[in-house]
Swiss-Prot record:
Source organism: Buchnera aphidicola subsp. Acyrthosiphon pisum (strain APS)
Family membership noted in the UniProt record: Belongs to the dUTPase family.
The protein's name: Deoxyuridine 5'-triphosphate nucleotidohydrolase
PANTHER family listed in its UniProt record: DEOXYURIDINE 5'-TRIPHOSPHATE NUCLEOTIDOHYDROLASE (PTHR11241:SF0)
Pfam entry (one): dUTPase
Cofactor requirements of the protein: Mg(2+)
Pathway: Pyrimidine metabolism; dUMP biosynthesis; dUMP from dCTP (dUTP route): step 2/2
Amino acid sequence: MSNIEIKILDSRMKNNFSLPSYATLGSSGLDLRACLDETVKLKAHKTILIPTGIAIYIANPNITALILPRSGLGHKKGIVLGNLVGLIDSDYQGQLMISLWNRSDQDFYVNPHDRVAQIIFVPIIRPCFLLVKNFNETSRSKKGFGHSGVSGVI
């Protein structure tokens, strides 16, 4: 297991808000909370940046963090991430910000302390490129989008 350093940037995190945490024993992602003074309106079809009040430092170049939407917010309310996935590099040390996008037709309200996203840590493979003139031929070759059809017999 790797240790990830965390820094509290906003004093409200010490008093009222909890640090990222797993909701259940089987959770893969740690919930990230909105560090706000007051409720913020996210208008329909608009985006907003929500501060978390924390910074992390991964330090290990073989680990990255991904900020992902919470499934319930996306499915039930239409609230997803404005950048779809937030990629946190191992050398980033700034505040974690959540870009929320309201893809619904209804305004949505983000309250202080709301769980608005989740963060997971994943291993990274950092390959070296080998320059070649040609690849070894495969049965797929250059076939791309839709090449296997819709029903795709296995």
